[in-house]
UniProtKB/Swiss-Prot annotation:
Gene3D superfamilies per record: Spermidine synthase, tetramerisation domain (2.30.140.10), Vaccinia Virus protein VP39 (3.40.50.150)
The entry's keywords: Cytoplasm, Polyamine biosynthesis, Spermidine biosynthesis, Transferase
Pathway: Amine and polyamine biosynthesis; spermidine biosynthesis; spermidine from putrescine: step 1/1
Active site (UniProt): 160
UniProt cross-references to PANTHER family, sorted A to Z: SPERMIDINE SYNTHASE, SPERMIDINE/SPERMINE SYNTHASE
SUPFAM superfamilies: S-adenosyl-L-methionine-dependent methyltransferases
Entry keyword Nucleotide-binding: no
Protein name: Polyamine aminopropyltransferase
Primary residence: cytoplasm
C-alpha cells in the first residue's frame, strides 16, 4: 500500500500487480479494536473504504459484489425466509437481501461495529435497510454466533468477509463450515466471497475442500467483475447439502423481480453458472 501524488495504490503480491485510485482527500480514519478503517474521497470513484490498507469498496462499483453475493443464492433457494450474514458490516449485502419480500428475517453479525458506523456516515445508500423490521444487526464474533445457532434454523448463510487473514481468518476453515452446515436446513445454502479466480484458484479449491469435509456435497463458484479489487475479477462460492445439486434457480422469479438491480439479471445468472474452461478444469467441474 502506498499513497503518493494524490493516488492511493494497493499492491497485490500474488500477481505482481497493483490497483490505484486518484484521491482528493482523506475524510476519516478510525482504529477499532480489530482493524484500521479509512475513508477517502476519490476524484472518479466516489468514496473509498479501506480496512487495514486493503480496498473494501467504492461508491461507484460496490453493486457488483453486493448483488452477486446475494441474489444468485436467494433465487436458487426455493423459499428463502431466514438469512444470516456473517460479516457484511458495510450493510450493502443486507440491503440486497431485504429486497426479497419473502425474506422474513435477516441477521447480520459483524465483529466490528465501527465498520457499520463508518458506512452509515459515508455510504448511507448502503444502509437503507438497517431499520427494516426484518433486520437484526449484531456486533459479535461470527464464528461463535454460527457455533451457537440452532440446528436446522437457517435457509441461507452468507459469509461477506474480508480476506482470510486477521479477524476473518476463522471464517475459512472446516470448523466454521461445520457450524454453518448444522445451522442450515436440508435445502439450505452457504455462500461465501471467494477471492479472485484469476489469481487465487488454489484458495478457492481449498475452501471447497474444507466445505466438503464439513459435509457439503455440491459447489458452484460464480465469477463476476469487481473493478476495485485486485485483478478486477472476483467470485462467490455456493455450497449445498444436496448431492449433485445443479444450482438451478427460479428463473421466472428472477425475471419478474420487483426491485432494481444494476448488474444482476436472470439472463446473467444463467450465464454465470457456466464456468470459464480454465476455472472449470481447476475446480474439477
Amino acid at each position: 500500500m502506498s499513497t503518493n501524488d494524490n493516488w492511493y495504490i494497493e499492491h497485490f503480491q500474488p500477481t505482481g500487480s497493483a490497483i490505484g485510485f486518484r484521491i482528493s482527500g482523506k475524510l476519516d480514519e478510525v482504529q477499532s479494536l480489530f482493524q484500521k478503517i479509512e475513508i477517502y474521497q476519490t476524484t472518479d470513484w466516489g468514496k473509498l473504504m479501506l480496512i487495514d490498507g486493503a480496498v473494501m469498496l467504492t461508491s461507484r462499483d460496490n453493486f457488483f459484489y453486493h448483488e452477486m453475493i446475494s441474489h444468485p443464492a436467494l433465487f436458487t433457494h426455493p423459499t428463502p425466509k431466514r438469512v444470516v450474514i456473517i460479516g457484511g458490516g458495510d450493510c450493502g449485502t443486507l440491503r440486497e437481501v431485504l429486497k426479497h419480500p419473502g425474506v422474513e428475517s435477516a441477521t447480520q453479525c459483524d465483529i466490528d461495529e465501527q465498520v457499520t458506523r463508518m458506512s452509515e456516515k459515508y455510504f448511507p445508500e448502503l444502509c437503507d435497510s438497517n431499520h427494516d423490521a426484518r433486520a437484526e444487526l449484531l456486533f459479535d464474533d461470527g464464528v461463535a454466533y454460527m457455533a451457537n445457532c440452532p440446528a436446522g434454523s437457517v435457509d441461507i448463510v452468507i459469509v461477506d468477509s474480508t480476506d482470510p487473514v486477521g479477524p476473518a481468518e476463522g471464517l475459512f476453515n472446516k470448523a466454521f463450515y461445520e457450524s454453518c452446515f448444522k445451522a442450515l436446513k436440508d435445502d439450505g445454502l452457504l455462500v461465501q466471497q471467494s477471492e479472485s479466480p484469476l489469481a487465487l484458484l488454489d484458495l478457492i479449491k481449498e475452501m471447497r475442500t474444507e466445505m466438503g469435509k464439513a459435509g457439503f456435497q455440491s459447489f458452484k463458484t460464480l465469477p463476476f467483475p469487481q473493478p476495485c479489487y485486485p485483478t478486477g475479477w472476483w467470485s462467490v462460492t455456493m455450497a449445498s447439502k444436496q448431492a449433485k445439486a445443479d444450482f438451478a434457480f427460479r428463473q421466472g422469479a428472477a425475471q419478474a423481480k420487483g426491485f432494481e438491480t444494476l448488474y444482476y439479471t436472470a439472463h446473467l445468472h444463467t450465464g454465470v453458472l457456466v464456468a470459464p474452461p480454465f476455472v472449470a478444469k481447476a475446480l474439477g467441474e
